[in-house]
Regions:
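Extracytoplasmic copper-binding redox domains, predominantly the cupredoxin/blue-copper superfamily
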Residues: 2-111
C-alpha cells in the first residue's frame, strides 16, 4: 500500500515539475538579433511580433549607435562586442540609424 502512495506522489511531483518548466519557457519573450558589422545593420530590415526583444550586437571596430529617427529610443555609443536591447510592445514601423555614420540605417516592423 505504501509503495503505491509513494509512486503516486512521485508521479504528481514529476507532472508538477514539467508543468512548471513549461510555464517558465512560455513566459520568455520572443527575441530577435541584429549584428552591426561592416558599417551595416544585418539584417537591415526586421519584422517581429509585438513583445519581441531585439538585441543589436556590435561586431565592428568602431562604436555605433542604434538611434530611432523619431527619437523614441537611442542606445548611446555601443562599443565593439557590446549590445543594446529594446523590447517592441506596439505595432508600427521603427526606422533607426547610427548617429556617427549616417549611411547606416535599419528598420524594425512590428506586426
Amino acid at each position: 500500500m505504501r509503495r503505491v502512495t509513494v509512486k503516486r506522489g512521485l508521479g504528481f511531483l514529476v507532472i508538477f515539475v514539467l508543468l512548471a518548466a513549461g510555464w517558465v519557457v512560455a513566459q520568455q519573450a520572443p527575441q530577435a538579433a541584429v549584428t552591426i558589422y561592416g558599417f551595416t545593420f544585418k539584417p537591415g530590415e526586421l519584422t517581429v511580433a509585438p513583445g519581441t526583444e531585439v538585441t543589436w550586437t556590435n561586431k565592428d571596430g568602431p562604436a555605433h549607435t542604434v538611434s530611432a529617427t523619431d527619437r523614441s529610443f537611442d542606445s548611446g555609443a555601443v562599443s565593439t562586442d557590446k549590445t543594446f536591447k529594446r523590447k517592441f510592445e506596439k505595432a508600427g514601423t521603427f526606422n533607426y540609424g547610427c548617429q556617427f555614420h549616417p549611411t547606416m540605417t535599419g528598420k524594425v516592423a512590428v506586426k
